[in-house]
Amino acid sequence: MEKFQGYLEFDGARQQSFLYPLFFRDYIYVLAYDHGLNRLNRNRPIFLENADYDKKYSSLIVKRLILRMYEQNRLIIPTKDLNKNLGHTNNFYYQMISVLFAVIVEIPFSLRLGSSIEGKNVKKSYNLQSLHSIFPFLEDKLSHFNYVLDVLIPYPIHLEILVQTLRYRVKDASSLHFFRFCLYEYCNWKNFDSKKKSILNPRFLLFLYNSHVCEYESIFFFLRKQSSHLRSTSYDVFFERILFYGKIQHFFKVFVNNFSALLGLLKDPFLHYVRYHGKYILATKDTPLLMNKWKYYFVNLWQCYFSVWFQSQKVNINQLSKDNLEFLGYLSSLRLNPLVVRSQLLENSFLIDNVRIKLDSNIPISSIIGSLAKDKFCNVLGHPISKATWTDSSDSDILNRFVRICRNISHYYSGSSNKKNLYRIKYILRLCCVKTLARKHKSTVRAFLKRLGSGLLEEFLTGEDQVLSLIFPRSDYASKRLYRVRVWYLDILYLNDLVNHE
């Protein structure tokens, strides 16, 4: 991003906060292309959606695109030309525009973020970026709460809602009109042939989604701060998680007047909000009546302000002492551990019954077995079967694939309270690996293991234990507790990498 700023120093568009002229600069396309190549996700460039984009990209195509953008009528795809090469050419241009728009529109956000934290002693903690970093927080906080709202974030069904949401953050009217034009043209092409693959860049779609969610969170956090007796934590501390740019004066004029009666009913200083994977949870120590009021508030917020039809069935009220909470691949619930404490006062001794509340995070074994059965690792009952599609690979390749999957699952579910389900998953993968190798060599499992020996599966038994042995001291007592301890790793950034075994 510093390279972008260096070029924009000589461009008058930046001084006037105009982004639209940047679409007609050749160097912006080059920088965006280079910026995408340097940011890899799962060994693939984020800038590229498929391999053909790299082959088609050239300076000549960029110049043609800029000439077409000077005359937007040439970017419109007539219905009669949707099946011709002209439609495919324009679709490729829209793909380039979506990539460029995502890169350009991030420039004012990065500049604003840099100026907001300039001079402040804000420390970056990369451990907070891990998926496992939230579980210690939940173990500390949820044990004191009673209810959790599990809400599925609705998506806008109309494109104009996305444009209006982006209007609060992008002040350039020309860029918004151009964005609306390209978005509607893409949807017309998509509606004509629904089987076509999306041409919009994933980074561009992620930016639209984050803008939509940020608009909702800015309203919610403002109302939450107004309705609470305690002062909320400044959002600058969490700049790595949420880029929150609130419109406080606008909210104060509109929402305080409309929700003045409701704010008095939602006063609760003990409230925690966590967003993940298109959902969010709201943990509180309220009564069932107040939880239903929160549910009513969220339904009306989405329907009235965002004009999105939001069904109340998408808001689940879970009682932690009775219900399980599905969170980031875990099933979490509260467990009561009775404790008996012996107390002695002078010569009199007596027993005190005490109950300790603990948050248990277990493995959803049924859903994982269903996923393994879908990928042909086992049947629906959990019995291992051979992976027929992998028999054409070499023995080392087959073994490495199974070992990678087994280690990734063990790595992610290392914080489970019940290790038996994890051992069952490992057993399925180990036996599936043996059956796959035996099928390749046209032999039985017993004869194959007898011929190669037990050293074949040593790769499954090592790896995770070596990591744990570096964390805990090497003693007999520690080795006995090695398979029962719960470990949360702070290096898991992407959940899709854990299941990427191809």
From Swiss-Prot:
Cellular compartments annotated: Plastid, Chloroplast
Gene Ontology CC, one term: chloroplast
Transmembrane segments: none
InterPro entries linked to this entry: Domain_X, Maturase_MatK, Maturase_MatK_N
Record has tRNA processing as a keyword: yes
Signal peptide start and end residues: none
Described function: Usually encoded in the trnK tRNA gene intron. Probably assists in splicing its own and other chloroplast group II introns.
Protein name, UniProt field: Maturase K
Classification of source organism: Eukaryota, Viridiplantae, Streptophyta, Embryophyta, Tracheophyta
